[in-house]
Amino acid sequence: MGLIGHSADDGIGATPAVGWAGVGTVTLRELATDRAHRAARLLDRHLLVLVTVGHGQLELDFRPLQCRPGTLVWARRGQMVRYGGQPGLDAIVVCWDTSSVADAPDGAPLSDGYWQLAGEDEDAVINEVSQLVVDIQRHRSGVLAEELLRHQLTVLLLRIALLPGGATPDETGAYARFRRAVEEDFARTRRVEEYAERMGYSVRTITRACLNATGRSAKQVIDDRVTLEAKRLLAAADAPIADVGRRLGFPEPTNFGRFFHREVGVSPGAFRQAQRAIPVTPAGSTRVPLPRELPVDAAGAETARSWGRA
């Protein structure tokens, strides 16, 4: 498993195409026909999944999300996704490349990214997504068409940001700033003091902000983020466990093993083996190398819940 968007030369199967304008759509059923998409994958672009028919699960960062018509999931760059492939479950998947659609909102950094739409909210999102699908199929080139598709995506994402739970009251407060700083540097340092000095806060202020937001200390928030990335890479890449540890700031494999066992309750090897044993429907999986670098969502997109232990 690897980062969505790499070429076949990277050992990674076909991925959702973003199209000539940097925006694309595909159905979940179409993805499920590709063996590479039925195993755990790391995303290197944002995906919106709007369930249209059936019932089942979509796994996002080891959280099973119950899906039925009207379920909306925003999966962000760097997250681990497992589509499931349950018979009868289908969805429209909207994908976009933030490098080519630079003005597209990243979504609230602390948002859950999971909604069960109803009423006017459901109608509005369905209408926006449906029109985007139609226009992507109709318009294949041209400056005006490119602007149309990008603006439609922006409107859709802004509408989602206005959903309940789509925005966070204080995106500039101590906790939000700390989360962004951790997202940028968790593989280099796990010391709260370094983050506090960089941000101009005291350790006590950051710890208090983390406790108020999550019930966990600042050090635990950092460790949760490192643990999540370790779980992602162990589940989704085939690099030796020692390489995963070094990528996350553990020069010595034994130190990484102790850290992971303390946080998860099992060794890195046992966790990887358990993830590999998860059945894929239909049968099949793809093994690919460790990504060359950790994907970092500039908005710090992972949520407090997704940082917790699975």
Could you say what each language-model-derived stretch is?
Residues 213-253, 273-310:
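Terminal helix-turn-helix DNA-binding modules in bacterial transcription factors
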Residues 20, 25-110:
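N-terminal regulatory/effector-sensing and dimerization cores
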